Amino acid sequence: MAETKATLTNRLLAVKHNSGKSYSEIAEETGLTNVYVAQLFRRQAQLKPDTALKLRAVLPELSDELLGEMMRPPMRSYDPNLIQEPSVYRLNEAVMHFGESIKEIINEEFGDGIMSAIDFYCSVDKVKGVDGKDRVVVTFDGKYLPYSEQKTEHMVSRLRQNGN
């Protein structure tokens, strides 16, 4: 019987927990962002073969079976109840509150388009504010993707239908 995503995720998180290492420590040792490392352990990202060797060196408890599962394309999904978790709720609230302004600035700086969440890097960092208190820095670093003008002459499917 196939293992569920939740069961596999729990096994992966147990390996991380047993290592005593944080996502940021694993990230530093593998050359990945801390959020990407968390995505790997939550089966939201695919582990690439060259990175698998680095991850195994950092976490020797990862079995060949677990590494193999991490290298399979994941089912990227989330629990809809996750929004009720306070940190996730506040992050969503911040994006929704600032979203329209961020969109306008993207349009001013780049033109009509979006920030990719595919060619995308994300990290979470801890810094001290000017008042000496801890602050959370969430960085979204995504490739700019312009919207295409939909000209029929560029529509490959239509070109093929017309014998071109």
Swiss-Prot record:
Enzyme kind, highest EC tier: lyase
Pfam families according to UniProt: Cyanate_lyase
Gene3D superfamilies found in the cross-reference section: Cyanate lyase, C-terminal domain, lambda repressor-like DNA-binding domains
SMART domains linked to this entry: Cyanate_lyase
Domain of life of the source: Eukaryota
Keywords: Lyase
One GO biological process term: cyanate metabolic process
InterPro entries xref list: Cro/C1-type_HTH, Cyanase, Cyanate_lyase_C, Cyanate_lyase_C_sf, Lambda_DNA-bd_dom_sf
Catalytic residues (positions): R90, E93, S116
Signal peptide residues on this chain, from the entry's feature table: none
MF annotations from Gene Ontology: cyanate hydratase activity; DNA binding
EC number: 4.2.1.104
Function noted in UniProt: Catalyzes the reaction of cyanate with bicarbonate to produce ammonia and carbon dioxide.
Family: Belongs to the cyanase family.
NCBIfam families: cynS
PANTHER family per record: CYANATE HYDRATASE (PTHR34186:SF2)
Protein name as annotated: Cyanate hydratase
Organism expressing this protein natively: Ricinus communis (Castor bean)
